[in-house]
Every structure is written in structure tokens, then in C-alpha cells.
Amino acid sequence: MLQAIYNETKDLMQKSIQALNRDFSTLRSAKVSVNILDHIKVDYYGTPTTLNQVGSVMSLDATTLQISPWEKNLLKEIERSIQEANIGVNPNNDGETIKLFFPPMTTEQRKLIAKDAKAMGEKAKVAVRNIRQDANNKIKKLEKDKEISEDESKKAQEQIQKITDEAIKTIDESVKNKEDAILKV
């Protein structure tokens, strides 16, 4: 019964860490990632659709991305969506593909993006702490219902705290690594 709570807690905390890493992939660092375009939607016959579902997106070098739509009639729509997304780049449409040339980041931009990474990390920590609180509430309910003793409850809550500390440590390391990657010139 307690093992199930531990496993569920670990699983939920791991999902929070995975969500943080997905969020990090949308932040720009020294090398531009195709994931920076993940949130951009294109109007595909009346349906908002992600870019990677209407064409291939690839990195040509550290500062250039190329979008090759599967249907050439989508070029203008993709171009419009990128401009509206306000990601700090103008699309270059050559009639076949769209190239995005990202200028090198200024020190100020790097600091702002690093600040965003830190905020994402704090959000993940809050999620982990909420998961800890839910697990502790389940343990307290078991104690209240006389399914476990007070000693077992205290030990279980200590175990949940250890799991939480590991998750927070992982988040802190991820944030530090991302900040280092962003601030590296």
C-alpha cells in the first residue's frame, strides 16, 4: 500500500521533470533547435496544425532552420504563422522552402532566456512539492483510518521527502545545465 504511494509519487515527479525538459527544448541556446518552433500553429484547411505535421523542419547549422512543407501552397501560411509568433526572425521564402536565419543572441537576450529557464525550473519545483503534499495527505489518511501506525506514517513521510529531495536536485541540475548552455558564448 505504501509502496504504491511511493511508486506513484516517483512516477508523477518524473513526469514533472520530463515536462520541464520539454519546456527547455523550446528555449533558444547557442545552437538553434527545431523545437523552438513547436508552439507555432499553421492554419491547415481550417485546422490549427503544428509545423512538423505540415512539413519537415531541420537545422542547417547553428543559426539556420529550414522548413520544407509537403504542400507548396502552405508556404505563405507558414510564413504568416512564423511572423505572428514573434520569435525574433523573419522567414525567407524561396518558393520551395522557408529558411529562418537567427541572429546571434545578445548578452541581454541570453540573460532573459536564462531567467525564463529559471522560472520554468521553479514551476517544476512547485509541481513536485504539490505531488509531495498529495502523497503525504494519502499517508495521513491511512494513519487516520488506522491502516498504518503513527511510526509507519512518519517513516513513509520521510521516504516521500527523500523522493522529493532527489527530484528537486534533478530539477536544479537541469536548470543549471540549461542556464550554462544559454549563457555560453
From Swiss-Prot:
Chief localization = cytoplasm
InterPro entries membership: Ribosome_recyc_fac, Ribosome_recyc_fac_dom, RRF_sf
Give one GO molecular function term: ribosomal large subunit binding
List this protein's GO terms for biological process. cytoplasmic translational termination
Q: Which domain of life is it from?
A: Bacteria
Q: Which GO terms describe its cellular component?
A: cytosol
The reply to whether tRNA processing figures as a keyword in the UniProt entry is: no
Q: Which CDD domains match?
A: RRF (cd00520)
| Cellular compartments annotated | Cytoplasm
- Keyword Protein biosynthesis (UniProt): yes
Keywords annotated in UniProt: Cytoplasm, Protein biosynthesis
Q: Where is the signal peptide?
A: none
Q: Which family does it belong to?
A: Belongs to the RRF family.
- State the function annotated in the UniProt record: Responsible for the release of ribosomes from messenger RNA at the termination of protein biosynthesis. May increase the efficiency of translation by recycling ribosomes from one round of translation to another.
Q: Which PANTHER family does the annotation name? A: MITOCHONDRIAL RIBOSOME RECYCLING FACTOR PSEUDO 1 (PTHR20982:SF3), RIBOSOME RECYCLING FACTOR (PTHR20982)
What is the protein name given in its UniProt record? Answer: Ribosome-recycling factor
Species the sequence originates in: Helicobacter pylori (strain Shi470)
- Gene name in the database record: frr
